[in-house]
Amino acid sequence: MSGEALQRWWHWAQGIIPAPERESGLRELKQFLRAFTGLSPLEITLRRFPPQIHLKLPLTELQERWQRRWQERVPLQYLIGVAHWHDLELVVTPSVLIPRPETEELLAVVAATVPPWQQQGHWLDLGTGSGAIAIGLARLFPAALIHAVDCSSEALEVAQVNIQKYALGDRVRCYVGNWFDPIVPLQGQVQGIVSNPPYIPTSVVATLQPEVQYHEPLLALDGGTDGLQAIRQILETAPEYLQPQGWLFIELMATQGKAVAALAMATQAYERVEILRDLSGHDRFLLAQTP
């Protein structure tokens, strides 16, 4: 494709961005173009395109994908096939939730909490999706063996691609199944559990922005009537798997802090229960520790 033709395409592409979203849409357009042309951020920002540009897919498909972003509200990450999260570039498909900044904060909480002597042994990522948490844990704790569980075989295929991409296949094991079901042999042996489970109440799912409501996997979003179905199950079962002084970290909806803390205390299985806030000041994470 010629640089002149790409200039014309750019003019068309920015023209279909809805006016209220123009600023964020232009940022997305730059990411979109970079993903499929290999041009540098500076070349794209200044629109100084070389005479000839190699497209990674036909121009007609490039155009169709960009139209889908605005006509169907397909998330950019699904259109380009990757999501940037923490310091990782993760493959994503509509089979997995797009990793969020809040989950980066969840890993930061883990890093700041767990002492060196517990940064080894068995760690669980329940509901791994793209594998973001499992990969983050493996990089954070080089001496640990990570067990990544998801009920979706399609999601696990994506996770395995990402795990191999970061050469962690020997330290991250994947299991298909519902929460603890595939890892029963690990009862009593686990140092810590980290999870970003579905926590949105069913009635709230229908109010989410179209990018989420219509395109991200419902399995990863819908937490049942009160949003706590999965969290309740994890809280009740985790003590059977954790070693003494084992850790449990769960990401929550901003309004669920008090309810989740009460559920954790009601199990009488944890000696320490805390609700921690995210960088926006919202209740976001449960930290619990067994005796």
From Swiss-Prot:
Record has Membrane as a keyword: no
Catalytic activity of the protein: L-glutaminyl-[peptide chain release factor] + S-adenosyl-L-methionine = N(5)-methyl-L-glutaminyl-[peptide chain release factor] + S-adenosyl-L-homocysteine + H(+)
Residues reported in the UniProt entry to bind substrate: 196-199
Keyword set, alphabetical order: Methyltransferase, S-adenosyl-L-methionine, Transferase
Region forming the signal peptide: none
Class in the EC hierarchy, top level: transferase
Binding site for S-adenosyl-L-methionine: 127-131, 150, 179, 196
Record EC number: 2.1.1.297
InterPro entries named in the record: DNA_methylase_N6_adenine_CS, HemK-like, RF_glutamine_MTase_cyano, RF_methyltr_PrmC, SAM-dependent_MTases_sf, Small_mtfrase_dom
GO molecular function: nucleic acid binding; protein-(glutamine-N5) methyltransferase activity; protein-glutamine N-methyltransferase activity
Gene Ontology biological process: methylation
Family of this protein: Belongs to the protein N5-glutamine methyltransferase family. PrmC subfamily.
Protein's name according to its UniProt entry: Release factor glutamine methyltransferase
Organism annotation: Thermosynechococcus vestitus (strain NIES-2133 / IAM M-273 / BP-1)
